């Protein structure tokens, strides 16, 4: 369909505050029974919880395990859980001119072996899994879940030595300040930094605003 042919049109947008969508009078399909949506931009899960509890908003997304547990049993609030297709991953540049050491396949395998996937899942919350690659478990082409015993620091160190980095190296990790389904990517970046320090890789976290792309 052409752009602008949907059932709603954006009538207002205030950066970092709210988006207003109103019924499209020229929509070609079956009419919707909701005239307007006001989408508040509020990345903080605790603030979302308070505004939801106070009746100021009708729906809250990107909630954390902690905030959901506080809302359980609350009057007039329903918690809906479901599987998503969201996959988080670390991209390593294959071009040596830009990626430096991480362009080396052995280094990439060392990084995979050095990460504490159980700890990462703890940060991400209940229900999360670690797939083998970017194809989520349950979809065609998925290799299934990464086994719990995949992490092996000694193997990671050996791979780094074979690649020519027995003492590790310094590397930048660029991460946006996005809250993805209740998970702060900057928190995950700090976890990755801590994990890789165990094998001599010194990670410098470079944070950039989501709006910067």
List PLM regions with ranges:
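Short helices/loops that flank or line small-molecule/ion binding pockets
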Residues: 46-56, 73-74, 106, 187-199, ...
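Ligand-binding "clamshell"
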Residues: 69-81
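Periplasmic-binding protein-like
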Residues: 99-139, 184
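Gly/Pro-rich hinge or "lid" segments in bacterial periplasmic/extracellular proteins
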Residues: 1-31, 36
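Structural transition elements
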Residues: 8, 129-162, 178-187
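Ligand-site clamp/hinge motif
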Residues: 24-70, 202
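Ligand/substrate-recognition segments at binding pockets and active sites
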Residues: 15, 161-213
